[in-house]
Amino acid sequence: MLSERRLEVLRAIVQDYVGTEEPVGSKALTERHRLGVSPATVRNDMAVLEDEGFIAQPHTSAGRIPTDKGYRLFVDKLAGVKPLSSPERRAIQNFMDGAVDLDDVVGRTVRLLAQLTRQVAVVQYPSLTRSTVRHVELLALAPARLMLVLITDTGRVEQRMIDCPAPFGEASLADLRARLNSRVVGRRFADVPQLVQELPESFDSEDRGTVSTVLSTLLETLVEETEERLMIGGTSNLTRFGHDFPVMIRPVLEALEEQVVLLKLLGEATDSGMTVRIGHENAHEGLNSTSVVAVGYGSGDEAVAKLGVVGPTRMDYPGTMGAVRAVARYVGQILAES
């Protein structure tokens, strides 16, 4: 167990290295921080930190830099989440308030996260498997042709054309619309099949074929749209950190091009709290020199998707965690109000 003083030395090393991009020496630490001890004592503390794997000495420098283990201890024990300033919060709100639909919300969120953190931003679209139904609309386009419009609690809109086996009157259409909404509004998509399975039997025999066709189209829409989607932005930010990657930046870029890799990264994040994965904690080899900060977002208490950033392990963790958390909250508010 590290003493409080050595934890403070580690905190100072992380802060200085993140801020200066240069390995940190004992003399610089005592000059920049009020550690209350001599450079010789700090050197001894740094030797202990190095022996225990929290810092390391690059072969080109006499200073020390944090290891993945050091960053992990910093995040778990020493780093608080840095709140955004009032101007930053107002800027976020003004930028996000202009969104007109879900695609625009996701696109703006990606750009905002990338600008705030100067990292690569990744935003997952709300998953229909976690969403609930806000409304189902049925519109008559012709006597035997309908349009089904499905609206989710996250503002997602899906449209399908339906060719009916027989003409379907306005009264029957209004009846089906009302009965369908009474059963499924506010319910999770996973529950919908069971909720509507007996609905055709409650209609006259001449309408049952059309009702069954409408329900089949609705359920097929749920299956088709369960594929996860995401948006990525700010990849060019990585070019500013070329020296942070031990070999080359290409493996990182290649990993970021694989949607399956990114979906797995976000999938490993918890729904409720902040998830920070550092260096080799990331299973994908191409991301072993990066850190991932992610959190769930949603229109209520339950997360419907996740968002986060990917950057070098030499990251401003308090500031990044604060930005990711704040943006997630604003997106959740927009979805709830939309």
UniProtKB/Swiss-Prot annotation:
One of its GO terms (molecular function) is DNA binding. SUPFAM superfamilies: GAF domain-like (SSF55781), Winged helix' DNA-binding domain (SSF46785). It comes from the Bacteria. The keyword Lipid metabolism does not apply. GO terms for biological process: negative regulation of DNA-templated transcription. Keywords: Repressor, Stress response, Transcription, Transcription regulation. The keyword Repressor applies. Transmembrane segments: none annotated. Negative regulator of class I heat shock genes (grpE-dnaK-dnaJ and groELS operons). Prevents heat-shock induction of these operons. Belongs to the HrcA family. PANTHER family: HEAT-INDUCIBLE TRANSCRIPTION REPRESSOR HRCA (PTHR34824:SF1). This is Heat-inducible transcription repressor HrcA. It comes from Streptomyces griseus subsp. griseus (strain JCM 4626 / CBS 651.72 / NBRC 13350 / KCC S-0626 / ISP 5235).
